[in-house]
Amino acid sequence: MSTNPKPAYRRVLLKLSGEALQGSEGFGIDPAVLERMAQEIKELVELGVQVGLVIGGGNLFRGAGLAKAGMNRVVGDHMGMLATVMNGLAMRDALHRAYVNARLMSAISLQGVCDSYSWAEAISQLRAGKVVIFSAGTGNPFFTTDSAACLRGIEIEADVVLKATKVDGVFNEDPVKNPDAVLYHELSYNEVLEKELKVMDLAAFTLARDHDLPIRVFNMNKPGALRRVIMGEPEGTLIHHIGK
């Protein structure tokens, strides 16, 4: 157990995959998973941590299959952006039910549904202790929600991007296929590139590297893992400029 009662981070950008919300359902949003995640985020807020949140849309829409069938990539990406807004609405509602103040911002204008993204307003809301959910990716096609997470993380001057996954961190091989795969506890950005480890897409990863934004990959399905990460305890994989 950590002897340090204070959080290791002041402001974080938490990236959740859309698939994380579907639980064992295989599609859509599992209400029990949504509620558990809202409670874990509430814990961070109660610790005094400022939380920005980016959620993917893969549980509601997957464009790859339709793209193969001939759908225009731009159209598919716009549909994916709307899927992230739907997930954001669900998360905002779950946080409100958990008595956590939250604001949903969209990179594309959706008047009457949620606020349009504003950097100054986002900073103001974070300082006021509200969770800010950033939806619709970057607002541009061809950019992933991982890119959106790194971009928003840099913009709000987050201390770290916390990438929540279904495995315990970054491994030398796929741990689902190889149970003997080795977990890395710490990596430099260059090591990730040299070893061709799958952390996030290259555009997102190099954006984080170029702006010296650390990334911590951890298992959101592991009870208490998010809190341990926040408290600076060894959990998951930390990717940063080693030596800093």
UniProtKB/Swiss-Prot annotation:
GO biological process: 'de novo' CTP biosynthetic process; UDP biosynthetic process
Enzyme class (EC, first level): transferase
Annotated Gene Ontology cellular component terms: cytosol
Transmembrane segments: none
HAMAP family xrefs: PyrH_B
Role according to the record: Catalyzes the reversible phosphorylation of UMP to UDP.
Name of the molecule in the record: Uridylate kinase
Naturally occurring in which organism (per UniProt): Aeromonas salmonicida (strain A449)
